[in-house]
Amino acid sequence: MNTAAQSLIRDESTPARTRWIWTPFLPLCLIAAAAALRRIFALLGPASPSTSPTAALDADFAARRALTLLHIVPALAFILLLPAWFAHSVRRHPRAIAVITRILLVLGAVIGLTAIPMSFHPVGGINESSASLLYDSLFLFSLARGAWLFHQGRLQLHRTWMMRAIAVLLGIATTRPIVGVFFATQTITHLQPQQFFGTAFWLGFTVTYIAGEAYLRARGTDSVTS
């Protein structure tokens, strides 16, 4: 094992750092996976009743079924692979982690590129679209930076940029409970999905991105921004 790989493993070995990442990480992965599966079943199954609170949202995704599936199926695969990418037991095997990393990079590219047309004419209008495009750009930039560093063999910085991309991606999971709160309080606020989806996206992505940045800086890599 080369020196870079050894130092990368040591960097993630302390129990405190492990707890820092796994405590919020697993719930977000579960939420994201559940949301993706729910959307896949909704697209492949019968249409939602017109009285369903999510009927308008389901109809919007159904109108671009192929694009939506091309976006969320790779996203589901990405989410399911993430625990292995973070697991210390897997990271002890450089070949295995290299294969997983390459798969994540390919899946991430598909997710990021398909998110661009998905961001046009969303349910939440220009507010949602602007949040999606901004954070998708940040995701693609972080992913590309991580890929370049990976192929350069600069594994610690590669991991930093990959984790930055992952924090952006998991922002979509944070939006789900926020959207749930908006739906649950509709009888009080009288807000429609077209009015609150953009706000939910801004809140979800921003909170998760800031949390990810805080973790990276507390983690104390040689350089968080190189």
Question: How would you name each of these model-derived features?
Answer:
Residues 2-226:
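Alpha-helical membrane insertion/targeting regions
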